[in-house]
Amino acid sequence: MCISTIKHYHDMSEAPDQINEKIIRFAKRFMQIIREVYGCERVYMCTMCDGPNNHYHIQLIPRYAYEKRGSGNFVKKRKAYEFDKEKFETARKLIAEYAMEKR
């Protein structure tokens, strides 16, 4: 899962503090939702802004109990993605509720 700004920033240091604060608060809630809905053990948060078309974003990476721990989880073999509409809709509903609370 990825959280990004609409306005372009190369990395967190270029974004205004107000934007960074909102992103971190949102990421915290989104991590709780991911654990609740998808049943993962942990959610890693990272920002890697180092590509040719750099753009500030935060990645939330679920780690399940059966997966190895540590930074090796940031690079995983690609596998077929199994879309779970019910879980997706539950997460979307909870995120929308959080967004409405913060208005």
Describe the residue ranges of each PLM region:
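HIT superfamily nucleotide-processing domains
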Residues: 1-103
